[in-house]
Amino acid sequence: MSLSHINTIQVTSGADFNKHHKGTIFYKFLNDDLVHHNFKYTLGLNTDIIKFNTDTRCSAGGLYFCEESKCHLYWRNYGKKLALVKIPNDAVVCIENNKFKSNKIIIKEITDFNDVPDKFWIKIRRKD
């Protein structure tokens, strides 16, 4: 599976995604109220209430997340909480440029920015 596609959207199963990304850590940034685009995130399984959209990039119809190495692109824009994300094997995942979306994600933990260890911030610092 190549992540270099720019004009096409790759779609894969959660099981294949997990196999290909074994050992990769995924995150989502959240607002204080845990609501983003009218969806309220909770610990545990989160399933989008909008029909999953595999046709359009950066669109409704999917719950977005990114890998740790791309966190520097998003941390300033989406609130002051960091959620650790896992993907269920029965999910559908779209691979977009620098991010992913899925019809369902599992939030394992939610941490306020003030409580996130310094090593995380050092690790995600953009290296140009």
Segments the model singles out, each with a brief description of its role:
Residues 1, 63-64, 125-128:
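Generic low-polarity alpha-helical segments
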Residues 2-60:
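ADP-ribose/NAD+-binding catalytic cleft of ART/PARP-like enzymes
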Residues 49-113:
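ADP-ribosyltransferase catalytic core
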Residues 111-128:
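Active-site-proximal loop/hinge segments that shape catalytic or ion-binding/gating pockets
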